[in-house]
Amino acid sequence: MADSAALLVDHILPPVDMRQWVISFPFQLRFLFANYPAVMSKVLGIFTRLISTHLIQKGGAKHSTARTGAVTFIQRFGSALNLNIHFHMLFIDGIYIDGFNKEKQVFKRVKAPTTTELNALVHKLSQRVARFLTKQGLLVEDIDNSNLTLDGLAPDPMQDLYGHSITYRVALGAQRGKKVFTLQTLAPQIEENSDSQVGSMAGFILHAGVATRGNEREKLERVCRYIARPALFEKRLAITGNGNVRYQLKTPYCDGTTDYRRSHVIFTPLDFMAKLAALVPKPRVNLTRFFGVFAPNSQYRITITQEKKPKSRMTSDKGDKWDKTVKEKRQSMTWAKRLKRVFSIDIETCEAC
């Protein structure tokens, strides 16, 4: 988490305005993405092109002369350890246009999206995803409604775990099929009107309320650490007196059946392992994607990103930095460096000296 955030801030993300876009999907699509990673990648491409077009048009430019970029983290988990595949995208909050010599890229910031624009984007996304799934033979539409057709899905023992995890139900044991037990320990909370930028339609929910300025590098790193966080936090785990697993929710929620908010979920040990198994992606599925100017093969990556290559090994004034072996370059940060980077705790310096 800390390594990924440091890599993005130090070497990839330029010192310009950035915005986090978060898109979540209906339950049926979450199940589809878990079983068909290739379909998930196609839908991610549809969403990326949609936001890119929105930014370019809002900046008053064309695709031929303007470009943008994004770093996407595909998260598979919800706050209750449920399977919830959704996308966290760090988009450049603007566009890059060609300069006078067409070699230097000039950044142009765009205004923050309004709620009306977010709702329009969600509507377009749902339509394009529906068209794509129909062409793939995965969606059958009639006059009344649309239904996913998963008849050709190859048998997989994980499908049962996926379905129960997505719908917050017990997957294994004597309580199989029942709702996961929750504790109601917090009093009702009066919800105030929020100015957060959210658009929603038919199970699609789009958030775009978190943004950073070009000079807010520490805030950007906190956002990166948040979207790169792991699924499980050990400090929220506890064992109950009867041997079950209790997991504390970061944000208590109300499911509508009672005014009291639910603060914990309870699993049997067997069902807890089933929940963790459902969060593991299929082999060779990359959960971090780079698009636009951040793509590995983009001709603009070297001129826009923070990472600069030396002209030669001899001209670098930091010779030892470029003389590192491949193994040394791939090593993670030490715990001492992580403490200093994340919590500003320098254990290598004595305060009494």
Task: Locate each region found by the language model.
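Beta->alpha loop/short-helix hinge microenvironment recognizer with preference
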Residues: 1-353
